[in-house]
Amino acid sequence: MPSWKGQSRGNVLGYKIFVFTLKHLGLSFAYFILVFVAFYYFLFSNKSSKSTYYYFREILKYSSFKAKWNVYKNYFVFGQILLDKFAILGGLKGKFSYNLDGEHHLRQMASNTGGIIINAHIGNFEIAGQLLERLNTKINVLMLDAEHQNIKKYLTNVMVNRDVQIIPIQADYSHIVPISEALINKELIAMAGDRFIEESKVVEIDFMGQKAVFPTGPFYLAARFGVPVTFAFAMKESRTHYHFFASPPEKVERYKDPEKQEKELKRFVEKFACEFERIIKMYPLQWFNYYQFWKEE
């Protein structure tokens, strides 16, 4: 069964290089450098390129040439996303414009019970916490990454908005404690719904024409703590403009009957997958999925 091994593309050294380039050379020059960086990854990152090619060729049905060209473009856009993220985290938010579609849904959650924001590795959701600072609530981002400790330290140093807190997922499940505390305090928890690691509880559904496996964990947490979920994405629409989407909050019911509970969790996974697929089709270059996702691959 395809599962993620706990490591995203990019590391602390890469993040430091991005920040240095932004501070000393500017965003435009950093974008120019990406032309060559993206080409390097296109040539030498065989495993991630294979998965991305499969996505464009077999799922989106692009021609072979178009699929290969879009693999390169995907790396380039991913680099832009990282640069934008650090520009905003480092205090350059004024260089970007954005429209918020569904901000009132998050405001509703923040003013009532708090809740869970379920996103994916698409677009640039990490910047949403900085853009949504006017919600006047803390946003906690779960980081599912093997390098989370070092990245957390570095991100903490460069972030301007301290209302964004990174919670690294731990093997001993000790991350449940800060999650519980955050939800008790009516804060927001943001976590990805398109990744899972081995031994995670999952469900198999139809996704973009093929069978795929999604985690039920985010929805189980919502049911356990009695808080609503919303699906949210922050998508790059032009060089310096982003569009934020958030769906109406919904409550995941908690049942004593295991069979009923599993059906409820699967129902919400399918809802998320449906919205996720809609966003992917609108912004096909911005899904940064660098591992085997579909079972047929």
Question: What residue spans do the PLM features occupy?
Answer:
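Conserved beta-strand termini and adjacent loop/short-helix elements that scaffold enzyme active sites
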Residues: 101, 142-144, 169, 247-249, ...
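Membrane-anchoring hydrophobic helices of lipid-metabolizing enzymes
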Residues: 1-119, 163
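Short, flexible loop segments at the rims of nucleotide/cofactor-binding pockets, characterized by
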Residues: 92-98, 165-170, 208-209, 265
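Non-catalytic C-terminal accessory region of glycerolipid acyltransferases
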Residues: 111-112, 134, 161, 173-297
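Short amphipathic alpha-helical segments and helix-helix/interface helices
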Residues: 103-107, 129, 133, 152-156, ...
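Soluble or luminal CAZymes and related metallo-dependent hydrolases
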Residues: 13, 48, 98, 171, ...
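Catalytic core of membrane glycerolipid acyltransferases/transacylases, capturing the structured
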Residues: 65, 70, 113-171, 196-203
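Residue-level "edge-of-site" marker
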Residues: 35, 69-70, 145, 172, ...
